[in-house]
Amino acid sequence: MGTISANKLGGLALIAGPVVCLVFYFIQQLGVIGTDVDPADGNAVVAALTANSTLTTLTSIGVSIALIVLMHGIIRLAVESGDALSNLGMKFVFVGTVGWVISAGLTAAIGGDVNNGGLYGGASGINQFGGIVWSLGFLLVVLGISAKDYINQNVAYIVALVAVVSLVTGVVGGFESSTLQTMQMIGGICYIIFTLWSIWVGKDMMARD
């Protein structure tokens, strides 16, 4: 493993990162919080997190690690491309990832002690704004690399459009909490599409080594 190339590691990160993140995310959303709990209802979410404290902590750790792995892959994609737009975008991806990891840490803290329930508002806000910044960065990276001959431009434009949708849902959910549950559902669908594209791009990156 010590001699693995930058492209191979970056490709693996693009494949494994989003898949693992998706698995832990859905375990937390479906297995810990539940589909009937509105994320805007802080008391209900806190009750669900503390009732499943071990799983809350494990999924928060899993999501955090997977997001960092994914970030490495995206940064490698931007560095390999070398264009100005994706270079800017990876800064946004970095900040968005940091926000998500902080939010995951606060979520784990809530799960560990019901007295930390007051942190939920902060965790939710950081998560929401982290998603906005990350989506903007991902959009810039996708647009930046779309002109490269090893990237399918038409598919890249579709993914860029999905990133715009993700960005809009983040903004709408941030301004109007009553829409948060619906916006997060749409955002989850966007992330699934991101994951499929990331796997494709990751496989191609490994092949370019």
Predicted regions: what is each one?
Residues G2-D209:
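Hydrophobic, aromatic-enriched alpha-helical segments typical of multi-pass transmembrane helices
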